[in-house]
Structures are given as structure tokens and as C-alpha cells.
UniProtKB/Swiss-Prot annotation:
Keywords: ATP synthesis, Cell inner membrane, Cell membrane, CF(1), Hydrogen ion transport, Ion transport, Membrane, Transport. It comes from Variovorax paradoxus (strain S110). It comes from the Bacteria. HAMAP family: ATP_synth_delta_bact. This is ATP synthase subunit delta. It is found in: Cell inner membrane. Pfam families: OSCP. It is a peripheral membrane protein.
Length: 176
């Protein structure tokens, strides 16, 4: 994992510098390409020595669903030439971190046992922004094993108010 991050960092930084005038647009196509590149079948095809860079680029362009911007084609071509196609999801992650740092925000993942409606999510987001002291881009993932409550992950910080966590704390306290 750390090796992927080390490989991805220079690509993410170079792309960020090259796209400083349109970070949001670049982020949009990069995120979409990262989802496409995460496909195990496409990874296997890209790793095949008989597959040319043009063939892989054609498959990605077809899966993209719209014409790839010229700089996206150039970037993808550079990754394919250097055998770094498999690093694309990590590059997207680091690019998002650079964009967040520039805008002074962070990504937050809220894990919940139950679905959260829009108004409740807005309240949770406001409370979390106050707690963490920065603007957050909140996404929700459902995890029924939490039983109740929420667990929030912002970067390397975790705020766990789930029933599961409290039961674990009680178990440890009773066993001591």
C-alpha cells in the first residue's frame, strides 16, 4: 500500500500542477477513470504484454462513455508507457487530497447502521465541520454491523459513536 502511494505521488502532483486552472474538471475525469481502472478484468488486460497502449486506451475510452479530453489521453498514455496503469486509483486518491488541501477541505466518510436522510446528513455534516474545524465533503456508507450510531473517518482521524464500539468498550471494561 505504501509502495503504491510512493509511486502515485509524483504522478498526482504533476497532474495537479498541470491542471491548476481546472482542478474540478480534471478531478471529475480522473475519478471516473480511476473507477474504470479498478476493474480486475481491465487490470489483467492492461498487464497483458500482447495488449498495446493504444488498445488499452481504446477500452478505457469506450468505458468512459464520452470522448476523453486530450490531456486525459496524454496522462493515461504516459501511465501505460511506464507500466503504471494499476496505480491510477491511488493517483486519483492523492489528487483528491491535493485538491482538498488547496481548498481547505477534507473528505469524510460517515458509516451508519441505517440510511441517513438529507436533512439529518446536513446536521451531521455541520456538527462534524465544527468538530474537525474544516469544510468536509461527506459521503455515507451503510454498515449494519454497527448496530446503531455512526463512525466517521476524516483522513487518519476516527470518531466512533456506534453501539458496536460502546459494546466493545464495555466488554473490555468487564473483562479487566
Amino acid at each position: 500500500m505504501a509502495e503504491l502511494a510512493t509511486i502515485a505521488r509524483p504522478y498526482a502532483e504533476a497532474l495537479f500542477k498541470a491542471s491548476s486552472s481546472d482542478v474540478a474538471g480534471t478531478s471529475a475525469w480522473l475519478e471516473k477513470m480511476a473507477v474504470i481502472a479498478a476493474s480486475p478484468e481491465l487490470q489483467q488486460f492492461a498487464d497483458n504484454p500482447k495488449a498495446t497502449a493504444e488498445q488499452v486506451l481504446g477500452v478505457v475510452a469506450g468505458a468512459f462513455g464520452a470522448p476523453l479530453p486530450a490531456h486525459a489521453q496524454n496522462f493515461l498514455g504516459a501511465l501505460l508507457e511506464n507500466g503504471r496503469f494499476s496505480v491510477l486509483p491511488e493517483i486519483a486518491k492523492q489528487f483528491r487530497a491535493l485538491a482538498n488541501a488547496k481548498s481547505g477541505s477534507s473528505d469524510a466518510v460517515v458509516y451508519s447502521a441505517f440510511p441517513i436522510d438529507a436533512s439529518a446528513l446536513a446536521n451531521v455534516a455541520a456538527a462534524l465541520e465544527k468538530r474537525f474545524g474544516r469544510k468536509l465533503q461527506v459521503t455515507v456508507q451503510q454498515e449494519p454491523e454497527l448496530i446503531g450510531g455512526i463512525r466517521v473517518v476524516v483522513g487518519d482521524e476516527v470518531l466512533d459513536t456506534s453501539v458496536k464500539a460502546r459494546l466493545e468498550q464495555m466488554k473490555v471494561a468487564l473483562a479487566a
